[in-house]
């Protein structure tokens, strides 16, 4: 029996980045031998065990053979005779196919992963790459993480990703897994690389058609020097990641705020009148298909519907501001307002030449929200009021508070 550290922990060590979970591969062992040493079996589809003290995952070396459609259509062989090199060969990218003997510090790198780390290239391990459609999503997600380090996708790997997209295999991806990869990309340093990689691989359309529909749609150059709505979408996603690092609620709402522009009739280009209302339908469709959590959908709908109103909040009547807050459920969910402000700021700054622009509207929104929130029904004299009259009096008092906070 021989144990090696594999995968992301080895890769991140070589990149001099903090490592996440430690994954281990065990060569030359059987499940019975693992359990005899105190390991607990947890793998459903292949033999994975938890270490009795650390709780880290130890998987028996295995090979995988394609047996059906999708990323679950594989036959697994975890015979004790499977070698380390055979186990590494089934992995997706060379940078993830490096093992380390922790006793000696020796690296086992049969597929050139160290070279590709040095050259900042994301490259597939072998021709079996095309057997798993999930790898297209993983490539895009890794690019969202590693593009800031200078990584690019190898041309031959991109060609295989396009082959997968053309095969129809992407249709076999389950919604939960698509959302899982998208969510990870949104909290990466450069979500735009996720979008751009899928777009270049012709995979964004099959997976996220609402987002693909924005590429090639022009906007008015005086407001959007980047012109292409798809590029604006990328810039807004990166700005959201910068303004709210690690917040996938902000990331998702910022990503989907302009979906309505993909539905603008071409004869109306480059104007997109009513795109904020038009965007709700494709947003709902995307959320239903990927089973997006309700909290994410509610914030995204609020940002999609109201971002133009927030941009011009100084022009809105005080009563209109209160109505805006009500539509966002901001008086019942006050934590939502700061995120809406961040999404709108990402929209305003996610434009060519506007990356460092101020966005005072965000502070105005938060200030007026606090003013409205400071007035509660218990603060009013409602002795002679009943039913709807109490609500009307509360609304009037809140409008007055908003006016005073201007």
Swiss-Prot record:
Top-rank lineage group of the source organism: Bacteria
Please list the reactions this protein catalyses: a tRNA precursor + 2 CTP + ATP = a tRNA with a 3' CCA end + 3 diphosphate; a tRNA with a 3' CCA end + 2 CTP + ATP = a tRNA with a 3' CCACCA end + 3 diphosphate
The cofactor(s) it depends on are:
Mg(2+); Ni(2+)
What organism, scientifically named, is this protein from? Stenotrophomonas maltophilia (strain K279a)
Q: Which BP terms does GO give this entry?
A: RNA repair; tRNA 3'-terminal CCA addition
What biological function has been recorded for the protein in this entry? Catalyzes the addition and repair of the essential 3'-terminal CCA sequence in tRNAs without using a nucleic acid template. Adds these three nucleotides in the order of C, C, and A to the tRNA nucleotide-73, using CTP and ATP as substrates and producing inorganic pyrophosphate. tRNA 3'-terminal CCA addition is required both for tRNA processing and repair. Also involved in tRNA surveillance by mediating tandem CCA addition to generate a CCACCA at the 3' terminus of unstable tRNAs. While stable tRNAs receive only 3'-terminal CCA, unstable tRNAs are marked with CCACCA and rapidly degraded.
List, for all copies, the residue spans of the domain called HD.
229-331
Q: Which PANTHER family match?
A: MULTIFUNCTIONAL CCA PROTEIN
Task: Please describe the quaternary structure of this protein.
Answer: Monomer. Can also form homodimers and oligomers.
Keyword terms of this UniProt record:
ATP-binding, Hydrolase, Magnesium, Metal-binding, Multifunctional enzyme, Nickel, Nucleotide-binding, Nucleotidyltransferase, RNA repair, RNA-binding, Transferase, tRNA processing
Please name the SUPFAM superfamilies in this protein's record: Nucleotidyltransferase, Poly A polymerase C-terminal region-like
Which cystines does this chain contain?
none
Free-text note regarding domains: Comprises two domains: an N-terminal domain containing the nucleotidyltransferase activity and a C-terminal HD domain associated with both phosphodiesterase and phosphatase activities.
Please tell me where CTP binds in this chain: 8, 11, 91, 138, 141
Which protein are we looking at?
Multifunctional CCA protein
Question: What positions does the entry give for Mg(2+) binding?
Answer: 21, 23
Instruction: Give the note.
Output: A single active site specifically recognizes both ATP and CTP and is responsible for their addition.
**Cofactor binding: number and manner:** Magnesium is required for nucleotidyltransferase activity. Nickel for phosphatase activity.
Q: What is its EC number?
A: 2.7.7.72, 3.1.3.-, 3.1.4.-
């Amino acid at each position: 029996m021989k144990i090696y550290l594999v995968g992301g922990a080895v890769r991140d060590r070589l990149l001099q980045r903090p490592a996440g979970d430690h994954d281990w591969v065990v060569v030359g062992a059987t499940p019975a031998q693992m359990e005899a040493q105190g390991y607990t079996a947890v793998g459903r589809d292949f033999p994975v065990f938890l270490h009795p003290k650390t709780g880290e995952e130890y998987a028996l070396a295995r090979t995988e053979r394609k047996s059906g459609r999708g990323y679950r259509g594989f036959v697994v062989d975890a015979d004790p005779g499977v070698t380390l090199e055979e186990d590494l060969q089934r992995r997706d990218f060379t940078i993830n196919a490096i093992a380390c003997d922790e006793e000696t510090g020796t690296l086992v790198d049969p597929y050139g992963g160290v070279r590709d780390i040095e050259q900042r290239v994301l490259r597939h391990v072998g021709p079996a790459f095309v057997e798993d459609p999930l790898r297209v999503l993983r490539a895009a997600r890794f690019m969202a993480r590693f593009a800031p380090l200078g990584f690019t996708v190898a041309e031959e790997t991109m060609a295989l990703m396009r082959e997968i997209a053309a095969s129809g295999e992407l249709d076999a991806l389950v919604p939960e897994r698509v959302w899982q990869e998208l969510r990870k990309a949104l909290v990466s340093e450069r979500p735009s690389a996720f979008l751009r990689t899928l777009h270049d691989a012709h995979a964004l359309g099959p997976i996220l058609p609402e987002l693909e529909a924005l590429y090639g749609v022009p906007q008015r150059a005086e407001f959007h020097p980047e012109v292409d709505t798809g590029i604006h979408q990328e810039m807004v996603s990166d700005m959201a990641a910068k303004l709210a690092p690690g917040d996938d609620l902000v990331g998702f709402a910022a990503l989907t705020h302009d979906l309505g522009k993909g539905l603008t009739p071409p004869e109306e280009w480059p104007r997109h009148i009513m795109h904020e209302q038009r965007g709700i339908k494709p947003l709902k469709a995307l959320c239903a298909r990927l089973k997006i959590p309700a909290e994410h959908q509610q914030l995204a709908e609020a940002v999609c519907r109201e971002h133009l109103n927030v941009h011009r909040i100084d022009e809105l009547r005080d009563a209109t501001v209160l109505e805006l807050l009500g539509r966002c459920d901001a008086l019942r969910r006050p934590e939502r307002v700061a995120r809406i402000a961040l999404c709108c700021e990402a929209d305003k700054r996610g434009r060519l030449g506007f990356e460092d622009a101020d966005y005072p509207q965000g502070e105005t929104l938060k200030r007026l929200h606090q003013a409205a929130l400071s007035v509660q029904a218990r603060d009013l004299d409602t002795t002679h009021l009943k039913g709807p009259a109490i609500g009307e009096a509360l609304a009037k008092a809140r409008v007055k508070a908003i006016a005073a906070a201007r």
